[in-house]
């Protein structure tokens, strides 16, 4: 499945700060980071 395990607000900041390359965030913010 494709979902964000972290809060939407957290993932929004992750994407805004270009942190989707981090394995932790790519996994836990999969939907927001588009890693589906």
UniProtKB/Swiss-Prot annotation:
Ranges for domain ShKT: 2-36
Principal location: secreted
InterPro entries given in the database record: ShKT_dom (IPR003582)
Pfam families associated with the record: ShK
GO molecular function: potassium channel regulator activity; toxin activity
One cellular component term from this protein's GO annotations in UniProt: extracellular region
Disulphide-bonded residues: 2-36, 11-29, 20-33
Keywords: Disulfide bond, Ion channel impairing toxin, Nematocyst, Neurotoxin, Potassium channel impairing toxin, Secreted, Toxin, Voltage-gated potassium channel impairing toxin
PROSITE patterns tied to this protein: SHKT (PS51670)
Residues the record marks as site: Important for binding to potassium channels: 6, 13, 22
Region (Crucial for binding to potassium channels): 24-25
Location(s), subcellular: Secreted; Nematocyst
Family stated for the protein in its record: Belongs to the sea anemone type 1 potassium channel toxin family. Type 1b subfamily.
Known role: Inhibits voltage-dependent potassium channels (Kv1/KCNA). Inhibits the binding of 125I-alpha-dendrotoxin to rat synaptosomal membranes (IC(50)=22 nM).
Protein name (database record): Kappa-actitoxin-Aeq4a
Lineage of producing organism: Eukaryota, Metazoa, Cnidaria, Anthozoa, Hexacorallia
